[in-house]
């Protein structure tokens, strides 16, 4: 004989995994060519000098140097550049 009544069903109880987006290398950090700087959805940060943009809008270093974040333009866009030494 059951000691508990049957539990009801629910339509909740699931969620997607986090996608690990965000800034991976911060301003002033030294990076090598190919290092991922930002993983993002859309272009929250735009590629500047010596920075490439992947098909999923990932920004990566095209040369060795220091990461530099700057806001410029009339639309106040954030750009990521690499200053070579």
UniProtKB/Swiss-Prot annotation:
Question: Transmembrane ranges?
Answer: none
Under Gene Ontology molecular function, one entry of this record is: structural constituent of ribosome
InterPro entries in the record, alphabetically?
Ribosomal_bL27 (IPR001684), Ribosomal_bL27_CS (IPR018261)
Extract one GO cellular component term from the record: cytosolic large ribosomal subunit
Q: Where is this region: Disordered?
A: 1-21
Per the record's keyword annotation, is Hydrolase included, yes or no? no
UniProt keywords (A-Z) are:
Ribonucleoprotein, Ribosomal protein
Q: Which GO terms describe its biological process?
A: translation
Q: Which family does it belong to?
A: Belongs to the bacterial ribosomal protein bL27 family.
Q: What PANTHER family is this protein classified in? A: LARGE RIBOSOMAL SUBUNIT PROTEIN BL27M, RIBOSOMAL PROTEIN L27
Q: What is this protein called?
A: Large ribosomal subunit protein bL27
Q: Which organism is it from?
A: Hamiltonella defensa subsp. Acyrthosiphon pisum (strain 5AT)
């Amino acid at each position: 004989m059951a000691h508990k009544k049957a539990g009801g069903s629910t339509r909740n109880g699931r969620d997607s995994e986090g996608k690990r987006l965000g800034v991976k290398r911060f301003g002033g950090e030294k990076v090598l060519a190919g290092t991922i700087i930002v993983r993002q959805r859309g272009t929250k940060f735009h590629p500047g000098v010596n920075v490439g943009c992947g098909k999923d809008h990932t920004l990566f270093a095209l040369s060795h140097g220091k990461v530099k974040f700057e806001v410029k333009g009339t639309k106040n866009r954030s750009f990521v550049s690499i200053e070579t030494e």
